[in-house]
Design a protein with these regions (language model features):
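Acidic/polar, glycine-enriched structural segments that form the non-catalytic walls/loops
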Residues: 2-295
Length: 295
C-alpha cells in the first residue's frame, strides 16, 4: 500500500520566489489581484521611474481607461469616419475591413487605434528631502516577492540610510495597494512618500506628465491621515482614497501628494475605483492580511 504524502504547498511555491540583489531595470516585480497591478522598482515603489523606460513602472487596472479627445471641438471619431478596405467574398457579398491607413484618413485611423487606452492611475515614489532619488543613491539592495503571500519585501539603503519596505495588493475583491516603510530617516523628515497623478497617453507608459491643465485632481475629503480624491480626465473619471497611518498628507501642486511620517514607520494604503465608495480605504495591515489570505 502506497503511503499518503501530503504536498507542502507553501514550501513548494516559496522555492520559486524571485529575488533581486541589484537594480535590474529589465526585471521589475509586480503585485496585483487580477484586476489591479502595481509594478515596482527595487525600492518596492516607483522611485526610479525615469530609469525604467523599456518596462515602465505603472499602476493599471482592468477598469482604468482614458479617451483623449480628437480636439477641443470634437470628442471622438467612429468607424463611420474610417475609410475601409473593400473585398468581395465567394458569395459576391461586399465586405469592409479597417485594414490599413488610407491617404487623407490617417488621423482617423490613428485615433481609433489609440483610443481608448489604459491609464496609469498613480505613481508612488520615495523622495529625499526636496530631491529626486536616483539609482546612484541606492545601495545594499535585496528584494524578494513572496509568492505564497503576494507581498514584495524590499531592503536597501538610500544615502547610507537603511530602509525596509513591504508592498502588497488586496486580494479579496478590493483594488487597494498597501506600502509599509520603516527607516530612521523618516523620523528626521529626510524621506517622504510622494503620489503623482498623470494625464493619459497611448504609449507604453500610459502617462503624460506634461499636460497638467488637461486633467483635475479634486480633494473631496481630507484630514491629517486620510484624503479622498476625484480624478477627472476629459470624460473619464475615477476616485482615489489615501490612508496614511503614522503620517500626514499634504497636497503639493495640482496633481501631487506628499506624505511625511510622525516617526520611524509609515504605512499607507491607496484605494482606487470608478465609484466613490470603492475608494474607501482599509489600513495597510488589513490589505497585507487580505493578500496573505488570498494567496
Amino acid at each position: 500500500m502506497v503511503a499518503e504524502h501530503k504536498i507542502d504547498r507553501q514550501k513548494l511555491i516559496s522555492g520559486h520566489n524571485p529575488v533581486l540583489t541589484e537594480i535590474a531595470t529589465d526585471s521589475p516585480l509586480t503585485v496585483g489581484n487580477g484586476e489591479l497591478a502595481f509594478t515596482a522598482d527595487i525600492t518596492g515603489m516607483q522611485t526610479l521611474y525615469e530609469e525604467y523606460q523599456e518596462l515602465p513602472l505603472c499602476t493599471m487596472s482592468q477598469w482604468g481607461w482614458h479617451t483623449k479627445p480628437v480636439s477641443r471641438e470634437k470628442y471622438n471619431y467612429t468607424l463611420d469616419d474610417l475609410v475601409m478596405t473593400e473585398y468581395v467574398n465567394r458569395e459576391g457579398r461586399l465586405l469592409k475591413y479597417p485594414q490599413d491607413k488610407k491617404v487623407g484618413n490617417e488621423d482617423v485611423y490613428n485615433w481609433l487605434r489609440e483610443n481608448p487606452h489604459r491609464l496609469n492611475l498613480v505613481r508612488v515614489r520615495l523622495q529625499w528631502e526636496e530631491e529626486s532619488i536616483s539609482a546612484e543613491d541606492i545601495t545594499g539592495v535585496r528584494q524578494e516577492l513572496v509568492l505564497y503571500e503576494g507581498i514584495l519585501y524590499s531592503e536597501f539603503q538610500i544615502r547610507n540610510n537603511a530602509c525596509r519596505v513591504r508592498t502588497a495588493c488586496h486580494n479579496e475583491g478590493r483594488d487597494i495597494l498597501a506600502f509599509s516603510l520603516e527607516s530612521e530617516a523618516l523620523k528626521e523628515k529626510k524621506i517622504s512618500i510622494v503620489l503623482d497623478f498623470p494625464y493619459g497617453a497611448s504609449d507604453i507608459t500610459a502617462s503624460d506628465w506634461t499636460q497638467n491643465d488637461r486633467h483635475r485632481t479634486t480633494i473631496l475629503q481630507t484630514s491629517d491621515e486620510k484624503m479622498l480624491l476625484w480624478r477627472q480626465l476629459d470624460r473619464d473619471e475615477y476616485y482615489a482614497g489615501i490612508y496614511a497611518q503614522g503620517g500626514k498628507i499634504r497636497k503639493e501642486g495640482s496633481h501631487t501628494l506628499r506624505i511625511f511620517a510622525n516617526g520611524e514607520k509609515l504605512d499607507i494604503s491607496i484605494a482606487l475605483g470608478k465609484q466613490k465608495e470603492q475608494a474607501e480605504c482599509l489600513s495597510a495591515q488589513e490589505v497585507m492580511n487580505a493578500s496573505k489570505r488570498g494567496g
